[in-house]
Regions:
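Conserved active-site segments centered on acidic
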Residues: 1-68
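Alpha-helix capping/helix-boundary segments
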Residues: 77-79, 177, 252
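Phosphate-binding/catalytic loops
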Residues: 81-118, 122
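Conserved catalytic-core segment of NTP-binding enzymes
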Residues: 99, 157, 165-166, 171, ...
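C-terminal boundary of histidine-terminating zinc-finger modules
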Residues: 111-132, 136-143, 147-149
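Phosphate-binding loop that captures ATP/GTP phosphates
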Residues: 124-136, 140, 160-218, 225-226, ...
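Glycine-rich P-loop/Walker A and Walker A-like loops and their local beta1-loop-alpha1 context
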Residues: 143-161
Length: 277
C-alpha cells in the first residue's frame, strides 16, 4: 500500500546513503494515499524523517523500477510481481535476507504504537542489511550478536556472550542503550568501559581485554535514532577491523512492551544467537 513499510524504508536509506537516489512504491498502492501519521511520527522520533508524502502506484513508478540497481520488497510474492514487470536487476525480499523469521516485519497498518515501532525497526534493519549486502561491508573479523528473547534471559545471554568473546578473543559490547546492563555485568565480575553514543568512534579500544565490556553510561531515549545512523554501523565496522566483536543487544521483549532495539543494533552481524531460557 506504500503507506508504512516502504516509505519508512526509503527514509532509512536516504539517511544512510544520501548520495543514492531512493524511491518507494507499493504493489497494491493507490496514488495519493497519505502516509500513516503514526509512521511519520515514529520516523521523526528516530531521526529518519519521511520525505514521501503520499503513496505511489506501480504504474506511476515504472520508470524508477526498470532503472533501479536494487529493489527491496517486503514479501516474496511482491518480488514475483516486480519480476513480472520485466525487472531483471538485483532484487531482495525481507523474507530471504536472514534465517531468523522473527526479523521479518509484518504490515504494521492497524497495530498499536509499540507493535508498529517494533515492525518498523525490523524494516529498518533488513533494509540496511539488504543495502550492505549489495554495496559491501568489509571487516576483517567476525561480528557475533547475542539477543536475549526476554528480560529474564538477560543473565544467561550475557554469560553466553562472555563465553563467546573469550573463545573468539573478541571485544564485548552492551548495545542496550535504552537500559544498559548493570547487575548482570557485576555478577560476572566484568569491568565496565564506557562509550558515549553521541561521540561514538572516539573511544580507544585496542586494549579492551576479556574481562571488560563496552557499555553506555546512561539510559537513552529513542535509541533507534542511533542504530539507524551510519555512525553506529561505521563504529562496529571499525571495531571488527581490529578484533572479533560480540554484541549483546536489548531483549526483544521488555516486561511492558515489544522493542525494536535488538533488530536495529544487529543488522550488520555475521552470526546471530537468540537466547530463550
Amino acid at each position: 500500500m506504500n503507506q508504512a513499510r516502504s516509505p519508512f524504508a526509503q527514509a532509512v536509506l536516504e539517511r544512510n546513503f544520501p548520495e543514492d537516489q531512493i524511491s518507494s512504491t507499493g504493489v497494491t498502492a493507490i496514488d495519493g494515499t497519505p502516509i500513516l501519521d503514526a509512521v511519520v511520527e515514529i520516523a521523526k522520533n528516530w531521526c529518519v524523517p519521511i520525505t514521501q508524502s503520499a503513496s505511489k502506484s506501480l504504474s506511476k513508478a515504472s520508470t524508477e523500477i526498470q532503472s533501479a540497481d536494487l529493489i527491496i520488497t517486503a514479501e516474496d510474492l511482491q518480488s514475483d510481481v516486480i519480476r513480472n514487470l520485466g525487472y531483471h536487476g538485483a532484487l531482495r525480499s525481507y523474507e530471504e535476507i536472514v534465517e531468523d523469521r522473527d526479523f521479518v516485519p509484518i504490515d504494521p497498518v492497524g497495530l498499536l504504537p509499540d507493535a508498529m515501532s517494533r515492525e518498523l525497526g525490523k524494516v529498518g534493519a533488513l533494509t540496511l542489511r539488504a543495502a550492505l549486502d549489495a554495496k559491501g561491508f568489509p571487516h576483517a573479523h567476525n561480528i557475533h550478536v547475542v539477543i536475549p528473547h526476554g528480560v529474564s534471559d538477560l543473565g544467561v545471554a550475557l554469560a553466553h556472550a562472555q563465553m563467546a568473546r573469550i573463545d573468539e578473543g573478541a571485544i564485548l559490547i552492551d548495545a542496550d542503550l535504552r537500559a544498559p546492563i548493570v547487575n548482570e555485568i557485576e555478577d560476572l565480575g566484568l569491568e565496565r568501559i564506557f562509550f558515549d553514543v553521541d561521540q561514538i568512534g572516539i573511544l580507544e579500544t585496542e586494549h579492551v581485554n576479556t574481562q571488560q565490556i563496552l557499555t553506555h553510561p546512561r539510559q537513552v531515549d529513542f535509541p533507534e535514532r542511533y542504530f539507524l545512523s551510519p555512525s553506529w554501523r561505521n563504529w562496529i565496522q571499525q571495531l571488527a577491523n581490529q578484533a572479533p566483536v560480540v554484541i549483546i543487544t536489548a531483549p526483544r521483549h521488555s516486561r511492558a512492551r515489544r522493542l525494536a532495539d535488538s533488530y536495529l543494533a544487529s543488522y550488520m552481524a555475521d552470526e546471530f544467537t537468540v537466547i530463550s531460557a
